[in-house]
């Protein structure tokens, strides 16, 4: 060991000797001069003192933190690299002696507790073993006694008594024996170790002789708690996992399980399979066998799903998914005083029979002049105050395209005025109006119009309508016939009187104090005001600010206008109004109801939208599958695509129905887009993408749409009369049909003789019997009226002169191109092919 003096140590640590001596004295060292020797232990004591004086009393640091940093380079691609730096930090903490002592004490406590638990378990095992030994001895004694009694008496009765007597004490060992039979020991080595460990702590250890005398005791089954985690408590290892029997927790059913399947209006294949507890693939396979190829996510309608479930042997419960609708209907029930309301009268009849003119006279306003082409193309709703009371009129279109509008008018009405022109008679739309009125169960009042014309024949009208089961009152029927003239006003008062008389008979009632309820007559999209719906209030009172639910649309009534465009605050029964504030244009015929709050309205509207979409998808797919073979040749059809925009919903429906009905097996019309309102930029883009024609019915295109139409050269047309659209589309379809080639026979020549020519070969000397024979036209050679050759007439001569044509009754020589087998008696037929335009 190297000895260092105080002076040398001061030089090493770079401190004055006096200061070092002072520090050594403070540390309790005996050094007083610079020449004294300092040992290593004294250096350590001095260092410890200095650390303590600087605030660290511990001889070693309690916490050490090590930091390590590694940098690697990662190639990203090409010559580009990225440096990746990984920093790791570890902290080591030295525990104090107090903590070490506390942990040691805790370990000792745990060890003592474990030994105590082990001792208690050993005592329990010994007690259990003694109990089993006693039970075994009792069983053997009972058996020996039973055997003695059986030998002593031959009767079976004592034996039975003995069995009954010992049944109770041997119940438990019998169960043990049964379990041993069922469950062979799978791990003998482990069981022997457990037994040896259990017997280790027993107090009584028998000698070798006793072991020879006493038979080996039965091993008691270790009881495990049925609801435990499957571990056996006890033993040195804490808990050991028991071997469980490899047995399923359920058994296969002996028979088919019939389940109750709830089916709503629509259900997917996957949902149906889940309710029947079968795999989706099974249902798909079954439906393939039924002839309906489906996918697992396909929506089935109620009837199809019911058929599948019943075929698979399950009970079907048809569920109504209209809980929201039922709640809404329940909330709309209102009791109040009913009062007499004005009748709603629909004016129906054939086109140009004077319906609007009659209304015009009643209203004292010129309505018909405002209609395009003088025909009605919307349902107009008006209410008129007469001397005998108020009457609400609905004016329906008479054109064939507006069938749905007329049906809608009949459903919303109380009385139908059937207008028939006295000079025209019963026409197709007249018959249709009668059918709609009878289907709706509405009484008919016949107005025989235009009686001021000299050719008017009212009796002819009565005969024609009697054939449709509309019997005049004077013939014993119930339909009043009133002759009127909308031009002169003749009979109009009598007509109104007849209408009001019918209304009195019907006893029409309404409750004005109830929330408003009605039907949508018409709807349109106004550029400045948004969706506008014409509503006929049928019951209750509709007020401005009410929250209304209309089909799949809802909204708050922001404003109400009467038929003259004047704002009103409320509308009672039988009053037609225009309402603003809906979130979309409802379909004509949708029911309008006033609901309590916006939340309820939104909830029901969203429910209806989802339901409508599901049903539509299900029906569309079913239609595709049913017509799969019919549609195999559809791709060969030529299609005229149309984007159609109209001013009101009713006209749009009428046009879509009429245009879709046009076409035949070769051409068809497809309305790729339709809507209410002006032609927008998106409509123009749709027409561009689908190669469609843009039709605007009483609407115009905005600036953006016009720009696209001009730039892309799209075909855009405006119309205000429905006839014109239908006629133009028919012409377009006719043009798409192309033309047919038709053959016209020009003439027939009979072969009288055959000559040979070195230039043309066989020349037929003929007599033209019919028509005219032309050179360079296609011909047919007929022998016994059977075509044997078809070719071209190459040479035509008369008296050695080439001619262009030969008339009937003249002789000529005919040379047939590439044909020499002409015989006397053959006929040569000259014809031409003409293109003929086809029509629908």
From Swiss-Prot:
Molecular function in Gene Ontology: GTP binding; GTPase activity; translation initiation factor activity
Compositional bias ranges of the Low complexity kind: 144-155
Ranges where the record places region Disordered: 95-155, 172-256
Localization: Cytoplasm
Keyword Membrane: no
Record's keyword annotation contains Oxidoreductase: no
Chain intervals for the UniProt region annotation (G1): 349-356
Stretches assigned to the tr-type G domain: 340-509
Residues engaged in binding GTP: 349-356, 395-399, 449-452
Gene Ontology cellular component annotations, sorted alphabetically: cytosol
Region (G2): 374-378
InterPro entries: DNA-bd_dom_put_sf, EF-G-like_DII, IF2_assoc_dom_bac, IF2_II, IF2_N, P-loop_NTPase, Small_GTP-bd, T_Tr_GTP-bd_dom
Region listing for G3, in residue ranges: 395-398
Biased composition range(s): Basic and acidic residues: 95-143, 175-191, 223-232
Family from the record: Belongs to the TRAFAC class translation factor GTPase superfamily. Classic translation factor GTPase family. IF-2 subfamily.
Protein name, as recorded: Translation initiation factor IF-2
Taxonomic source organism: Pseudomonas aeruginosa (strain LESB58)
Gene from which the chain derives: infB
